[in-house]
Amino acid sequence: MAKVKKAFFCKNCGFEAPKWLGRCPSCGEWNSFTEEIIARESGSVPATVAGPLPVAKPQRVRDIRESEHIRLDLGNPEVNRVLGGGMVPGSLILVGGEPGIGKSTLSLQIALAANGLKTLYVSGEESAEQIKMRAGRIGIGNDECLIYPETLLENIVAQIAEHQPDLVVIDSIQTIYTDLLDSSAGSVSQIRECAATLLKYAKSTGTSIFIIGHITKDGSIAGPKILEHIVDVVLQFEGDSNRSEERRVGKECRSRWSPYH
């Protein structure tokens, strides 16, 4: 039997507390705690998550292979430019934007246009048939792009381990859940756990991962604020109010690979 545990999570930063608190001791936000039910079985970690991850070992500085200069061409000059010349292998990139702004279309374009790269597009919001129809409208073909409609993190990690793609797109982080937790997809604990697992996989295997995140009414990315600190790059996708409504603007809000950081 799994041991059921109730906990309270801050919606702003993801801080966990055993009881409700009026003010978060981590970020200082008031009235931000929500109760979630977590079910964990003692000592149980799904093999699909724990198995494929290589174990890192300490290395001397002189023995570490330099790869910072290597960037992958995504086949889209504008996206490459925003990312500083291409995508760094093993990076976790968060793409945020309003509903309907075109996050899924942009991410599918990237997956299809990345010639020479094996890509995996994971959708928790559309069927394979719907994605194929959208790909047809985009008009870009890529035989190395795999489509996988799934929401269970353990299954997603297993498919990534099996196919070993260079690039993975997760659409969206709010629809993904892990069996390690009993809370619903999109909850603070689920978003934090899934993002942390994807980050660990990206760093240990060199697989680059794009995750799409929805934004709230106030313009911030839905989920705990810690999500933006877990990822390597935060891209904001929005409309250009000064130009045509069909024009979209991509902004790099944060990047570990920026020369200014």
What do the predicted segments below correspond to?
Residues 2-5, 16-93, 113, 117-118:
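Detector for small/aliphatic-rich hydrophobic stretches
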Residues 11, 25-28, 247:
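Cys/His/Pro-rich metal-binding microdomains
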Residues 90, 98, 108-197:
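Conserved inter-motif catalytic segment of the P-loop NTP-binding fold
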Residues 103:
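Conserved lysine of the Walker
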Residues 175, 217, 255:
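Residues immediately C-terminal
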Residues 199-251:
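Phosphate-binding/switch region of NTP-binding enzymes
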Residues 250-261:
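Positively charged, low-complexity/disordered segments
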